[in-house]
């Protein structure tokens, strides 16, 4: 899942800016795992957000009736500088990788700009509501 927290990506731009995030969520060793691939600059909030496995995001995976459900809750520091207030605007996208023997054999993406070159300006708008 990716976030353009300041909604400042341009459609023709490729690559992340210093306010963007990319998280990988999955199961490793039978346990849910969250890995931050890219995090925003600490210039916005003085909080370091290095890449790596993190425990801040609450993440659960459950299987029910042959279906798999993923649930995640991202605390404020994991999406900063996004302002968590009604009306705040960001861009986001989601990708589901199709894997076989540890290699990606395909993917499904919610919007363009996430499966290949990263292009936050192509992601969908998201508005926080009360």
Question: What residues fall within each predicted segment?
Answer:
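Structural preference for beta-rich elements and adjacent junctions enriched in aromatics
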Residues: 1-130
